[in-house]
């Protein structure tokens, strides 16, 4: 790939700095781009991550791991290699990793997006020699509508359901996507409820300084609660379960 990075069975490795970026298996030092489970894995001895996402990392990995939380743009020297983190726009605390040694600069994007998002800082372009990009949706067949269009449709659907006394259910991953949904909907339409995992993640987001509408735990409601007009946000894993059937 470059002299700075190589792909190993544990993931991207910087030999000169002796650290990995989002490694797949436990290592001594991991630079982690964001707190989603496929990137922030447990078992590493030391973690370097963006301070903006500290509370989300702690929710994901607990209080025990040794973390070095850094501000965006703050430099760390790891065995002669300069490392800094820069906004990736994917979720709160998501970062690109800038790696520099002897004039060569490599940037590992991690997951990122270019659309504006009130739950995270916007993607920051960084000048570099090598850009290692995430490309899950890199094919040209993927064309995304604007956030304004998507949330306009969601709010209109929720309003229509509320008008006939029906609840509305949205699925979103507990950490990241659920909070993005909550930040975009109109909370004046009706009450908002969430799965316990989502409510806990929202608390971590608020601790990181993200403004989200009030959300009540579904578990806190009585067994005969009237869900008319409510918005319920649930993880995809709840689909088809007894938990979700209470809203039928």
Mark where each language-model region is.
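Structural motif
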Residues: 24, 52, 172-173, 195-197, ...
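Conserved helicase motor "Helicase C" RecA-like lobe of SF1/SF2 P-loop NTPases
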Residues: 181-196
């Amino acid at each position: 790939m470059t002299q700075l990075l190589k792909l190993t069975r544990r993931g991207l490795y910087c030999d000169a700095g002796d650290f990995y970026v989002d490694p797949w298996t436990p290592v001594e030092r991991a630079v982690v781009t964001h707190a989603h489970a496929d990137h922030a894995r447990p078992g590493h001895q030391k973690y370097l991550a963006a301070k903006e996402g500290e509370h989300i990392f702690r929710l994901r990995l607990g209080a025990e791991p040794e973390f070095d939380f850094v501000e965006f743009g703050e430099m760390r020297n790891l065995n002669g290699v300069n490392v800094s983190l820069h906004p990736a726009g994917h979720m709160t605390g998501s970062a690109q990793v800038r790696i520099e040694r002897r004039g060569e600069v490599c940037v590992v994007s991690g997951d990122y997006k270019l659309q504006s998002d009130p739950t995270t800082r916007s993607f920051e372009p960084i000048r570099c020699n090598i850009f290692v990009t995430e490309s899950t949706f890199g094919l040209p067949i993927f064309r995304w509508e604007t956030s304004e269009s998507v949330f306009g449709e969601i709010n209109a659907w929720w309003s229509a359901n509320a008008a006939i006394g029906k609840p509305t259910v949205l699925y979103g991953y507990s950490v990241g996507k659920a909070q993005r949904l909550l930040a975009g909907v109109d909370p004046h339409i009706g009450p908002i409820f969430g799965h316990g995992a989502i409510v806990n993640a929202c608390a971590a987001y608020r601790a990181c300084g993200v403004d989200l509408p009030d959300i009540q735990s579904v578990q806190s409601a009585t067994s005969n609660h009237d869900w008319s007009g409510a918005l319920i946000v649930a993880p995809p894993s709840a689909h088809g379960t007894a938990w979700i059937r209470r809203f039928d």
